[in-house]
Amino acid sequence: MRLERGIDVRKVIDVGMMMLLLLLMAFPFTGQDIHIFLGIIMIAFFIIHHYLNRRWYLSLFKGKKTKIQILFITINSLLLISIFGVALSGLTLAGYVPIMSYFLARKMHLVCSYWSYLLMGLHVGLHLQVTKRIKNQIIVYGIMLIGIILFTKNQILIYLLNMSEFLYVSDRTNMIIYMFEYLMIFILFVLLMNVIIKEMKKK
């Protein structure tokens, strides 16, 4: 979908979602009010994104699926579930849709947020083949190594596995460093999916 001046609405929405995602992950620095405001905008963008890509859902029931198509469906389905969990628990925490206990909503919001972040990186990697544009693969694996180091440093795994009820951020970390590190972690999963697809196409 394009506007009169040739602006691709899908790309605008996608870039907007990426920026919102980073800001939402920076909750320790933005505070609750801004986080809720950004979260509501993210939900709106998410709905628009799926509306603009509604034809993809119709294609699910057509023909036999390849391994890569099955991977697409799996990642997108898990992402849809995790973002639904983020939205539902977030609206509960904000007091708009109190359908579960505050304790459950808090745990659900933290876990689903990190899974959504990881899956969003994989989702972008399905559509954006960054590794094809980088001739030197050493650079690709170097960036991935940095992502792995920052993934470990920020203890992302404990949030994915629901091993912590709270988000821990060092007092020495500022918002710019925090967002840069999370961006590198996001890029790690984009590149990881690029590598996976590349290997699948070889078989």
Stretches found by the model and what they are:
Residues 1-203:
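Membrane-embedded alpha-helical bundles that constitute the cytochrome b-like, heme-associated redox core
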